[in-house]
Each structure stands twice: as C-alpha cells, then as structure tokens.
Amino acid sequence: MFKTGRVFLLILSYIISASHSFSQEKSSPFSFNGYLVTMESAIFDSLSGPVLFDNVLHNRLNFKYYVQDHITLAAEFRNRLFTGDMARMGNAYSEMIDADEGIADLSWNIIEKNSFFLNTTIDRLYADFNFKKFQARIGRQRINWGQALVWNPNDIFNAYSFFDIDYIERPGSDAVRLQYYPSPSSVIELAVKGDRDNDLTAAALFRFNKWGYDIQFLTGYSNSSDLTAGAGWSGSLGPFSFRGEATWFHPLKEFSNTTGTMILTAGVDRIFKDNSMAQVQLMYCN
C-alpha cells in the first residue's frame, strides 16, 4: 500500500516538469529544475528469434535550498514509468529496479500492474557545507573519482555501467565526503561510504595538475574486503585527449598472497569541429 500524498506529488511533478524546467531567481533561496525523456528499447539474441519491446518514461526533479552562503540542502528524484514486455514477465524485473544498495532504502515501486509499474528513487539527498578552502558533504551523493570515459577502476564508490545511457547523473552513495583545496588546481579528499549489507568503503585521494595533466593518486579500503591503491590521469596528447586509470585490489583475507588484482584502462578521444566525437579505450585485468 502507498500513500495518496506521495502519488499526488509525483503526478503534480510530472505535469510541472513536462511543461517546462526552470530555476528560481538568484535572490530566492530555493531552486528547482528537471526534465522528461522517453526511451524505447528492443531486446533480442538473434535476428530470427523473438524480440522484446520496452519503454521507459523518465522524469527527473532536482530541488536545492540555499540555507546560507555556506550551507546547501539538496534532494533529487528519479521517477520512471516502465511499460512493455519485460514489465509483463513477472515481479523479477520490478524488484530489480526497486533494489536500493544504500544504507537507507530510498526506492519505491509506487504502482505495480500486470503491464507497467512506476518507480521513484531519491538518488541525491545531502547537506553541503563549504567555507574557504574546505568543503564537507553528508548524505546520498555522487563521488566521482573517474578520469576515463568508459571504464573507471578509480571510481570505487559509484561503479556503474557505461551502457546505462539514460542515467547521465549516475548513481549516488550514502557517504561522508571531506574536501580541502590547497590551491585552485589541487584537492585532497577523504570519503567514507556504507551500504545495505553493512560493507564499508573508505579512501583518500590527492589530485593535482602537472605538465598540463590532471593527475591523481588514491588509497583505501573497498567493500570491507580489499585494500585498494590507484592512480589516474587526463590531459592532451596532440589533438587528442589522453585519459587513463589503474587500480589495484588486494583481499585482506589473502594478505600473504602478493598478487592481488590490477585493473588498468587507457584511451584517447577527440571532439571535431562539428561537435562529433571519436574515442577508443582499452582495459587490462590480470
């Protein structure tokens, strides 16, 4: 059973965001924006086999409240209406969509019928504090430590699939993140994340600019199981952008084993005058 007020809020939100997205004037302590998109998909394993057709109507709502110059509160909603063949094949699909990996379960299937279901997820819910060179963010947030465009072994807090093309914001984590900026081109970060299985990820990162490249080093503890160390870079190589990352994982339970797992990726990309883009990226895992 669901609350009528929640459904009313979602319906009202769909109407507002479908008509237009807007932000309040700068003098207002509140801001709101969003969008409405739809994606049709076809699933098949051969041209002669059966084809499954699905549609997702995706609405996003972003709210921010600027309490003071140094304090911001944010809540962002991802509302999706699923229709089609996958929605008609039982509860497994809707249960997978409803799954929330965070400490708090902030995903709900508001309506479930035989041929469609409506899910809403709060993927950002945080308080942000900043003062001079220091910034702290507490709550569900995106911690993006990746440098490459396809695979991101440095992104130990928010792993995601490159093929999840309808989710440009990427998933968030229930975390505490501290940042200190020694200079305009460098940052020291410390982040701690928990999840629903009580696994802990904690890591530190140092990023700086040298020789025209953004270079970073990180070390930490991943998913209550692995010691982690890594590095990443992004910069220019002639007319191309050159990016890469490497991360080493070593299980604590097998500490005497000196091999561990190394994931290395590197790639080049280029944006042309007509705004088209070409990219190549390779990955190695031992």
Language model: regions and residue ranges:
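Bacterial N-terminal signal peptides that target proteins for export
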Residues: 1-8
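Flexible, surface-exposed loop regions and adjacent strand-edge segments
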Residues: 50-53, 89-98, 154-158, 250, ...
